[in-house]
Amino acid sequence: MGTIFGIVLSGLAGAGLLYRMGKLEQTVEQVTERVSEKVKEITQPAPKFEVALPDKNDPDPVQLGIGAVINKPLFSQPDNAWNRDISKEPVDPNSQAIIARIGADKPLHPEFGTFYRGAPNGIPYTVVAGDQKKVPINFDRYGDQSDREPYPVPDNPPIEGGPQGKGDRHSLILDRDNWKLYELYDLRPQPDGSFKAASGAVFDLKSNRTRPEGWTSADAAGLPILPGLVRYDETMMQKEIKHALRFTVPKSRRAYLPPATHHAGHSEAADYPPMGMRVRLRADFDVSDYPAEAQVILKCLQKYGMILADNGEPWFVSGAPDPRWIDMNTHAIKKVKGRDLEVIQMRDMRQ
């Protein structure tokens, strides 16, 4: 414990938190409290988060459970926006200005991995069978733009940030037999066994149909979330991601592009990115020296790009948590900066 205490104190001092040129920056009590919190973080037991491993006795290409293998396209339609190859599409005339607005020197950031602050890192999903019992959801924020029908929420559903998470608390549920996707934002199990959520959306994955114009979903842009996640099974087992990814920016434009149906911005300035905007990694960007999983992600960004889906941190790429990720390898994509990306030509912008 003494060693840990010394390491933490060194880190705090190195960050200029103890004193600077003789001027006390923090009281002893504040420093002690921060050290205690850091020691707890370092010494606490690793959180438990298990995903469904491949079941050789289940012949279905889509298996059951949390983080289960999905060995088929979520949207099978070749013309679906998520499946579109955008590697040859023209660059938008305003690309450089938009990239600069988001952050030309800001890195790509994998918003997924093993654990972060004691909780699974990423947006979790679970696959259920068609006979999974459905339960009503009490929508208390965006009920007028939610699909008000029962949702097949399993017992102890995985929630973004964990059971006590304070963030977006997304929960994604895929019905493999009816091929429908149920997504919830700010899901909160109640003491009586019922559920509350801010919003919810149901997507028939057999169709290209989007949300009604002007409607949100469990995501700000009105898009489904699961089709845009970096998943372990695709990256490490199938070794190829064949769809666009989801990403966030700090501030967006008061506009959206299909397949998005909703905006979450206030500015109408042309250098602010609209929801549904698509960017790709430059074709001449050399990915050969990156770890295998990072190469899979970067090649996906060159061919399919990523779609702006929510406000958040700059260039945060969304994915599903999995204890099998090697965080050091996925974090290699941080070497990619905003200036290495380009906005593809935007058409049919709506407000």
Locate predicted features.
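Short, low-complexity patches enriched in S/T/P/G
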Residues: 1-3, 21
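Hydrophobic membrane-insertion alpha-helices, especially the h-region
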Residues: 3-16
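Composition-driven recognition of long, low-complexity, acid-poor segments enriched in small hydrophobic
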Residues: 17, 24-46
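Short, surface-exposed polybasic-aromatic patches that bind anionic ligands, especially phosphate groups
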Residues: 39-351
